[in-house]
């Protein structure tokens, strides 16, 4: 396998803003907190020209893809430790994060039975494809697009209460942990493939298309309760009894809608944009549930 060369050019811009909080009143309370916002934009272009050698003949392929992405996220954390007196210690630690991600990709490719650069400057240009097809030098061409979106919310919390029962280390601790997450992802993808040297039953170029819309909401939550009793039995030696109960719940409801029975190229006039689901769904000839 040989290659004429490839080009990858990408840009990635990031931003971050943060805030920290610290407060302490000795022997009574400690507070720590932070908030972070992060944003990123990505842009990656890939251009590839290659040749595959099989015996004395070769096949040539060109591919051009453009990928865009962006992410916004918030993260907040807090910690409180309170000691109202020498016998009690209470700790509380919550956190929450929010994240949204977007992506869109456009890719074009074509396969040739001769080196296309001997006849045209830009093999993936529509006019070039048409010219090379008339000269029987194009094997197939393909166009794919994808838009994706993700939305995730996550929250966690812990509260712990410790009570000293004596001055020699006897104590009891109760701890409760909880977690919750809600995620939602969507993807709409199109693939249009045309074979120039494979005819259908009507004597026309054979085509293939795959159009899919995927939805995947997921929810998870759970909690845990733990109780611990410590009894000193010797110098720096303790006997500990503990009990823990955990519960968790998870639900994922994935849906896939297949629009491949629509005509080839039905979405050609749509330019992929972030969260542009409605532009695609407006082209449907039947209700979404029928797919």
Give each language-model segment a name.
Residues 1-291:
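Primarily recognizes Gram-negative and organellar outer-membrane beta-barrels
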């Amino acid at each position: 396998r040989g290659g004429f060369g490839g080009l990858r050019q990408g840009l990635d811009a990031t931003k971050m803003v943060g805030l920290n909080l610290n407060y302490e009143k000795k022997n009574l309370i400690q507070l720590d907190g932070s908030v972070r916002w992060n944003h990123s934009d990505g842009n990656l272009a890939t251009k590839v020209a290659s040749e595959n050698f099989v015996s004395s003949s070769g096949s040539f392929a060109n591919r051009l893809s453009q990928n865009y992405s962006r992410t916004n996220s918030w993260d907040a954390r807090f910690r409180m430790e309170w000691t109202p007196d020498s016998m009690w210690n209470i700790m509380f630690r919550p956190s929450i994060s929010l994240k949204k991600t977007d992506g869109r990709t456009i890719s074009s490719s074509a396969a040739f039975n001769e080196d296309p650069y001997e006849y045209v400057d830009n093999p993936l240009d529509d006019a070039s494809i048409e010219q090379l097809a008339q000269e029987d030098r194009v094997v197939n061409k393909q166009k794919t697009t994808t838009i994706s979106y993700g939305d995730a919310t996550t929250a966690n919390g812990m509260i712990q209460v410790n009570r000293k029962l004596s001055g020699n280390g006897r104590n009891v601790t109760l701890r409760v942990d909880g977690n919750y997450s809600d995620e939602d992802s969507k993807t709409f993808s199109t693939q249009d493939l045309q074979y120039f040297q494979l005819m259908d039953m009507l004597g026309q170029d054979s085509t293939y298309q795959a159009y899919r819309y995927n939805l995947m909401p997921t929810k998870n939550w759970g909690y845990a309760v733990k109780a611990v009793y410590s009894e000193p039995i010797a110098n720096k030696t303790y006997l500990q009894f503990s009990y823990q109960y955990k519960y968790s719940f998870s639900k994922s409801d994935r849906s896939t809608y297949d629009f491949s029975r629509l005509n080839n190229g039905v979405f050609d006039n749509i330019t992929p944009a972030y969260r542009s689901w409605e532009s695609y769904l407006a082209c449907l000839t039947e209700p979404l549930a029928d797919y």
